[in-house]
Amino acid sequence: MTRPGSLLDSSFDLFVIGGGSGGVRAARMAAQRGARVALAEGSRMGGTCVNVGCIPKKLYSYAAGYAEAFEEARGFGWRWPQAAAPQLDWAALKSARAQEIARLNGVYEGLMTQAGVAVLRGQARLLGPQAGGLQGVQVRAADGRQTAHAARHVLIATGGMPRRASVPGGELAITSDEMFDLPAFPRRLLVVGGGYIGCEMASIFHGLGADVTLVYRGEQVLRGFDDEVRTFVAGQMQQAGVRVLTRCDVRRISAGADGARQVALTDGQIITADAVLYATGREPNTRGLNLAAASVAVDAGGHIEVDEHFATRAPGIYAIGDVVGRMALTPVALAEGMALADQLFGPAPGQPARQMNYRNIPTAVFTHPPIGTVGLTEEQARAAGRPIRVYRSEFRPLRHTLSGSGERALVKLIVDDASDRVTGLHMAGPDAPEITQGFAVALQCGATKAQFDATIGIHPTLAEEFVTLRQVARN
């Protein structure tokens, strides 16, 4: 046990480990309540979302959409010489992305400075209980210098990291962390994994001009989403030109003489690719935290175990975000950070303490077409054992009547038959995430199908389909 005032360099009310969305939000809110707060981060501020996740992914998704838009413009009368067709400047895209990420890194750093949070650059590890009921944290800077600190409360918000390939030659594969900054654009890309990250990357890089093959060991991609939506989006991806191989996996990866990768699949195929992206899931980032020193328990998947108040089994130590494995979404980590700050240091004057509510959390998948979803899937609703009604519509968006694109849209409502409440809303099509965000408010307020029906739609839009669905597809 280290004694404060001897080997410890400083003490705080709250010590946050991790400068991602959840950690920064908790630190800022706590500091605004008058707490003495420190935050340790060994890399760039902003965490996965800002640096190698949500933000660069969405920027590249925008970029991918332009190639399709250029082609569709011909259907609306736009003409240009074929020789002058737009070409992707990969270096320019990377540079623009890097500039925006650097700006956001600065924004996060500025938020900490303005709030009076002490930012410590380096890797943090737990030291265990200290005198006076405090917890100890050691920070090792890049130059090897170490400092020790104590805090009444310690928050672990270190997020997650991509799972690496474990097949022979797996070291030749890359993860989503490296995907946005490849030295050269991969003209041939093999994506391993059919989750949302794999499907997003396959769609994005296909849109940017790559020849993409997606390999997934399951029967259908996007496990966990509504089955009908999964089938629909997989079909749309294949129609666009992404090759999707299900019930198939990688046996080994070899290096070719020209720098290419030779990938042997379990079905006997050999695929040559310029890059092999492994997107087979993410795992909690707890390496080097020295959790055992503070008796912080983890589950079988390595996620830190917490109760409904984000408390670990170790007194004074809390965890939020991807490292606890509840819902790996940036807005969830932000909400958890605010709820914890209220819990530990009280809410803002005149405001009630925030409470976490994990019901009806909307989410999106930025495939082409994108997905927006909130509430129960049809499968979840049926498994609950209550009678339901399913409303759906699949159609060709107005834009594509002239564009010549074969892209279609799907909208779907799940309704509890007894209460008439809309318990699930799903969409795949243009602007699906933007549309779903608004309807998520309605579901959170307990909107009924009758209330949807009584709402006049905006015409002509895709969103109006949700308030004009009348025919029950299944019950």
Place the predicted regions along the sequence by residue.
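Short hydrophobic core segments
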Residues: 15-17, 124, 148-159, 191-192, ...
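Beta1/beta-strand and adjacent pyrophosphate-binding region of the FAD-binding site
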Residues: 7-20, 185-195
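FAD-site-proximal beta/loop scaffold in flavoenzymes
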Residues: 170-187, 270-350
